[in-house]
Amino acid sequence: MPEFIIGARGHDFGRQTPEALFSAIGQAGFRCTQLAFPKAIEGVKSYADVTPSLVEAARAASKASNVGIAVDGTYVELSYADEEKRKAEVAKVLSQIPVAKALGAGCM
């Protein structure tokens, strides 16, 4: 039977650099996190700000702190009645699929 792992939402630790964020989560005793870049990483205002170098910094910080990324937190509204708004939200989700894969996050 798999070990039970306790995690925390990254943004409950405030907006920080990936290194500081993962360090704080690990020091608080958690082994995994939900990482929502726009809510938890300083300087990220939208998913467009999530660059490959930032994803790599988060991946490296996760590894260094031994805090896994269980969830790539992608906060979107997929039920807009307005088709253009809905399509914009779908595009956000699609842009984060490769990010989730790179981070090893099994859930979005």
Language model region names:
Residues 1-107:
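N-terminal pre-domain/capping segments
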